Amino acid sequence: MRFSRALVFRSAIVALLCAFASNANAELVARNWIAVSHQLAPSGTGTIDFTPHGTQPGLLYDIQPPEPQCSACHSIAGGDPSTSPEFRPFTTWSGSMMANATRDPLFFAALDVANHDVPGVGDYCLRCHTPRGWLMGHVVKPGFGPPNDPVKGASACLLNGTYDAPDDINSDMGGVTCHFCHRLMPNGPNGEPGYTENGNAWVDDVQCENTGGGPPCRRGPYAYDDGTAPPPHEWQYSQYHTESAICGTCHNVSSPDVSRMPAATDRIFGDGFDGSGALKTLKLDDGTDTGHPMPIERTFSEWQQSQYAQAPETTCQNCHMPESEDPDATACSYRINNRTGNLPVHAFVGGNTWVPGIIKGEFGAGLDTSGTNRTQSLQQTIDWSRQLLTTAAALDTTIQSYTPPTPSVPGAMALSIKVTNLTGHKLPTGYSEGRRMWLNVQVRDANGGLVYESAAYDPSTAELTQDPQARVYEVLQGIWNFHGTGTCDIENASNEKMFHFVLNDCIARDSRIPPLGFAPATAADPNGYDLRPVGYPYPETSPGSGVLVNYDTATYTLSVPAGTVTPLTATARLYYQTASNYYVEFLRDEAVNQGFADENTMCSDGPNRPFTVGPQSRTRGEYMYELWNNAPDDATQPGYGKSPPELMQTSAASTSTH
């Protein structure tokens, strides 16, 4: 009887939402509620299982916090070399977005949208953003004891700690922690196959043979020979920690694989649903359903299908954990066994320079109270990220043709600009929403006057002008047939871009530049649907090879006004941006228009509430918008710039040498 009431209740909710919301929004909400109702577990769980695979909460050995369990030996200590902040594991990790994945305000604003779109799906998001909190039973699934409130859990309201508190035993805010990564296994405890997506991790939860100290095993790419001093904890050599597959655990993301008890639910819904499968599957532009789980992020797979995955491999770690060149580099402050020199630095930097600065400004003072110099580490991450971005691409500008202007007759110019991807994945890669890279092209006269510009950017509004010749590299995912147009729709009824991460089921455009040797087709996906460019042609290196070029050649034609002072200089600049204006504005608008609660109200009965840092009495979306929009000296809420674009490369050519 209670199932029947639940169905009636859901139907009533859909009807009310459709009656009172705008047509487009009602369609989205109603469709979402219907989709969710078709996947609800029977009474007793009350939620969909978005995380059915891998090690589950309820460990024999807790995931220990980084402070002081790891920092005591693996951070800076008295007498260490002055370069120690550049290589000591805890110190370098603590400034990374890995370490601060549970402090990222952009993530939390997006989390609220996801939970609104598909109630409870935050469980799937938080598995990678707070693996300690998830495995300790502080999200949706309890570790031990009474059930969690699934709504509060999926919204991260049950996590211990605060955004500005040290990563100690009282905090789940330490992101992807040392103890989590160094307990990862390639297979399950009984030989179950491993996973390379969605945080479906196998975590070592046993004692091992090297019982030098406290259990459980800490796994890593080092061994201790007989007669040498072991660490004060159990250890085991792990080849897995040198392989890219370990990164694929969270850097391949598909629409969640949901699970329920089909025998009971099918009697209720009669939909023939078999109990598990992807929440959303990828549809082609004509509506054909591929049956593939929607490929949300594919950084690991992009690498896997590139030349970098071929022998001799260049792994993720080679670029994102580069070996220190300092002869004094050590992993441990005790410096036992005299192991120094080349050491994989736990830098984990990518292209994100903006959010580490926000975390530094918003939470740095509190994080520094433990004496770990967190603000220094965050700044180091920003600096390293900028440096890495300059190595990600090559840029070459060529004047293909030029007709000089005269005092009375206009001239003409044709440019060719080649952008080559030097990374082991698409450029840009990873989280699709808001990320973009573009070519800004300017032609100036002999006096520096602007003659022509493509992809002009206004830093005061963060508006990127997308003129007909503009080159913007991004992936735009959407909802197929959302407006009844029979296409992949990426805008709402107001012609504003929408970002419904967990509802997307199609790719309208993927213009990102492939890596070297990139072959999108695989045995499991012979058409390359998951990885191929969409709406933007990248030719094969040779006809029929199946391998795409790793560069884009952009051409520009322009008229030069009569009387322009020559020679002319054409300059190309390649920029990267973490979050576009329309993404941040969408997060704010969703929070306001959908009536999201402010964070302290939403999490009112959670640990350590109310918070005195972060959103507090604001919604997470509005807080994110203020961080993006406000002036740096705003007395109420300082801003940190509108995700300022980072200059990656520049290249120029002059008519004086043409």
Predicted feature residues:
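Primarily the internal scaffold of c-type cytochrome electron-transfer domains
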Residues: 28-52, 79-111, 142-511, 516-538, ...
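Local sequence-structure signature of Cys/Sec-based thiol-disulfide redox active-site neighborhoods
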Residues: 53-72, 119-122
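Bacterial N-terminal signal peptides that target proteins for export
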Residues: 2-12
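Boundary at the C-terminal end of the N-terminal hydrophobic targeting segment
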Residues: 24-26
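Extracellular Ig-like/FN3 beta-sandwich strand-entry sites
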Residues: 565-567
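Conserved, well-structured interaction surfaces
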Residues: 127, 131-139, 149, 156
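N-terminal catalytic scaffold of extracellular/periplasmic and nuclease hydrolases
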Residues: 107-125, 134-137
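Bacterial N-terminal signal peptides
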Residues: 10-20
